[in-house]
Curated annotation (Swiss-Prot):
Belongs to the peptidase S51 family. Exopeptidase that catalyzes the hydrolytic cleavage of multi-L-arginyl-poly-L-aspartic acid (cyanophycin; a water-insoluble reserve polymer) into aspartate-arginine dipeptides. GO terms for biological process: proteolysis. Coiled coil: none annotated. It comes from Pseudomonas anguilliseptica. Residues 1-23 form the signal peptide. Its EC number is 3.4.15.6. This is Cyanophycinase. SUPFAM superfamilies: Class I glutamine amidotransferase-like. The gene is cphE. The active site is at S169 (charge relay system), D188 (charge relay system), H222 (charge relay system). GO terms for molecular function: peptidyl-dipeptidase activity; serine-type peptidase activity. PANTHER family: CYANOPHYCINASE. It is an enzyme of class 3 (hydrolase). Inhibited by serine protease inhibitors. Inhibited by N-Bromo-succinimide.
Amino acid sequence: MIRSFIRSSALLLALLPVTGYSAGPLILVGGGLKDDNTAIYQRLIQLAGGNGQARIGVITAASIPESDDPDAGTADAANSKANGEFYAQLLETYGAADAQWIPIDLDQISNNSNPQVVAQINSMTGFFFGGGDQSRLTQTLQTATRADSPALAAIRARHNAGAVLAGTSAGTAIMVQGPMVTGGESYDGLRYGVYTTPSGDDLSYDMQGGFGFFNYGLLDTHFSERGRQGRIVRLADHTQVPFAFGVDENTALLVQNNATLGQVEMEVIGENGVFIFDLRNKERGTGSTYALYDVLGSYLTAGDRYRPVTGQFVIASGKTSLRGRERYSAAMTVTTDIFSSPNNSGANGRRKPREFVKVSADLFDSRVTSTLGRTYETNPLSRRSVQKHAVRQPWLPGHRWRQEHAVLPAFADGFPS
């Protein structure tokens, strides 16, 4: 076990930069960003130069254009221009000296090479990418061969010079360097596999990736709320990417250089948490059904930090170790919707959002070492075993656990041996 850990740590060091993170910070929001999330918005303003100094360019090309919005020009408008103007006003409310919509969308693709728009971009100290559909971002900010347009090249140059980039939902997903998830549900990914063309609930991804600002693993959003643990692990396994990051709603993963340490450091900001999955020591099952074992998962919440070069986790002060203080003798009743299925929905959406987190948190506050979670779909039934890691210290609310995945026939009552 120790030798295996040393070997895998050496692999990690070979994959990641060993020097400081030279570009500007990244603020990766998992979607569902509330207007009153002071922690995230104020951090964006601070990193862009501070109150009265920050100049933020707002990019909402992931939204539908004005020409496709039946409510354009009304208070119900939800198009690129309306969303851009809304975010610009909100950012100025939080202290930006200036915030401007960058007028590039499906109605105005040619603006990605307009010298005036490029000059506008060059005057900014930070950028905010709104949500929607990341395919619209590739259509509007990249060329037909997926090269940078002049506008994206200018954004990249500003970022390399220190400008902060923030994104939410699709605006976060597009930041990834490697394979980019484009759709799908956890159950479907585990049951049917991975595709390169989006269709319904199929797990799909773009092999060419996103804009390449985040190079530490896969990225996913709306994570715990939509039970996306299964889909990101399946995609990471399929694409042979050793790490995957899932950001919850109204929550951000801040990625920036720690000058004192001389290396990149990630910090969780906001309401919920961020999952980090480590697949370096994964093992595939040998049976006829898909099975994956020894995936390590960590769940960090506000103030917790992760240093990817060394693999070190730093738990925020004020959080207390649960070891020896567990309140329960048994974990919660086995859930029948571990991945918060959209097929189990009511008037307010998914009936059991964040179910994976609830099950895991309950496990760590108990004196047992493992629990099971079942999927809502039963043909076939999929079970998940969540286990406490035998070595690492559990924390609340920064839980860490070992996770096993397998898709089993409905009549099975255990994992493949």
